[in-house]
Amino acid sequence: MGKPDHHSFPSDMKTHATPNCDILGAPIGTPDHCDEWVMNKAIRKATKLMPHLVKLDAPHHACLLLRYCLSFSRMVFYLRAIPVDCLPSACDRFDQAVLQGLQSITYYKFDDNAIIQSSLRLANGGLGLRKSKLHHPAAYYASFRQSKDLICGFTSSLNWNNMPHFASARTKLSEAIPDFKDEDSPTQRDLSARTDLLQKSDCSTRLMVRNKARSNAVSAPREVQFSRAFLRQRLAMDSRQMN
């Protein structure tokens, strides 16, 4: 965004030349500005609410609140509106806050595989706590593609590959989904579903038979079994250690 010319305003008007602003609930400007703006709007408010999940003394209800009110749904608008390269640390901070909220509910530390599984959608045996950083390219790319016809209706034909933010999202999406093609479905739902499946496949290759069976057994109607199975496994381990 270019800075305004001072001569275009009355001489007695004070002006502040800056490339940064916010419009329609989203920041525009430098990566630092966008990053700080999202941390103030999404992360700090969410982290204030996370400690109250434990006070419910009902892990299942707390998990539902975490999933639908304090996790990916809280970030998805920003992910669709802000370029991938403009949130260098906000996504990491937010994902870490969600993980800490989940661990506070279960009282146990999750291993790497359990963390990955918790970020999968329910249909893939997860808890639906999608990582904002992983799904940011899919969200921004989908938003850009869905707006293409509208944008072209107001402007002349555009070379989308020469638009840096779109090209960057396309590149990162190809890294997350190696077999992605331009003619594939551009909706965020489909792109995130493919990302989830690749995550699940990668996680399954590292799971032992018992944990793989647990992963495949968990589905949308029984997502609470994920937490119960994990707790039972940890309690069994603690019992063996005590003996």
Predicted regions and their residues:
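Charged boundary/loop elements
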Residues: I82-V84, A138-N243
